[in-house]
Each structure stands twice: as C-alpha cells, then as structure tokens.
Design a protein with these regions (language model features):
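Core beta-strand-centered patch of the WYL/Sm-like small regulatory domain
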Residues: 139-156
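N-terminal low-complexity or simple alpha-helical regulatory segments
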Residues: 1-131, 145, 153
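Conserved short histidine dyad/triad with adjacent acidic residue
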Residues: 132-138
Length: 156
C-alpha cells in the first residue's frame, strides 16, 4: 500500500457539499433519491448538518450527478457545461508557462463555458487579485446551498 492510502479510505466530506451538489438536481424538479442510493448515501443524512459521508461515496455521487444531468456543472448555472468541457479548460491552463498566464486564460475561457460567471485578474507587483463574479443571480438567496456550492466548486 502506498503512503497515505489509509487516509483516503477514511476521508470524509461534510454533508453540506452533498446538499449543494444536489441543488441543481432539485432545481430541475428531479428527485435525487436514486442518485443518493446508487452512491450508497442514506438520504436521511441530509437532514443533519453535522453528517459526513465517505469521500468515495461523494466522488461517486459527483460523477453520477454530472452524468445524469449531462452537465459537468451539476445544473447550477443557466447554461450546462457539457461533458469534456472541464478537461479542455484544464488542458488549456496546464499548458500555460506561468500562473499569471494560466489565470488570464481562465478569465478568458470560463465565461465561454459558464456565461453566468466572470473572472478578473489584477496584478499588484508580486501579488495578484482574483475576483470571481456571477453575472446573474445564481439563486434567490445568497446562502442558497447551490449558489454556495457553485462558488466553492469553482474556487477549488
């Protein structure tokens, strides 16, 4: 076994990430029960904020939601992010010679994939400021689980 493999088996994810991930499913009027069951997640855990699930179950759910919605952005934005889009974005960024170049590419390309979002990058000497802005409200309330998850997902 490789170093750290025991940690991967015991790693967990807060249930809030599951709630956020499922927000797009619910917005489309779909019941997430089958997706949760297929990933081995007890739906009752969603009612308890302190709940955690295994990282492996979360990863399974993450992939199932993207596949079910045909959207790598999980139905959280007005325009779906078609399968393969994220890989193309990552490849474009990975080919950059510098972090500055990668961030500027991200600022140009992300709005093509997700028109609801803009990114601004400003350099201040050796430091840079990165601003992620929604061009339209992603939800009626700023604390909406889907809106919060959308920003967390994009910032990871």
């Amino acid at each position: 076994m490789g170093k750290g493999s025991g940690h991967a088996k015991s790693a967990t994810v807060a249930i809030g990430f599951v709630t956020g991930l499922l927000a797009g499913v619910r917005r489309q009027g779909r019941d997430p029960a089958d997706l949760l069951a297929a990933a081995g997640i007890d739906a009752a855990l969603l009612a308890r904020d302190e709940s955690r699930i295994p990282l492996t179950a979360y990863a399974d759910l993450y992939n199932r939601v993207a596949l079910a919605l045909d959207d790598e952005a999980f139905g959280l934005f007005a325009t779906p992010m078609r399968p393969g889009s994220f890989e193309l974005l990552v490849r474009a960024l990975a080919g950059a010679r510098t972090l500055d170049e990668a961030l500027r590419r991200l600022a140009r390309f992300l709005p093509i994939l997700l028109p609801d979002m803009t990114i601004a990058v400003e350099r201040h000497g050796a430091q840079a400021e990165f601003t992620l802005t929604a061009t339209r409200p992603l939800a009626a309330h700023p604390a909406d689980a889907g809106r919060v998850f959308a920003f967390e997902w994009l910032l990871r």
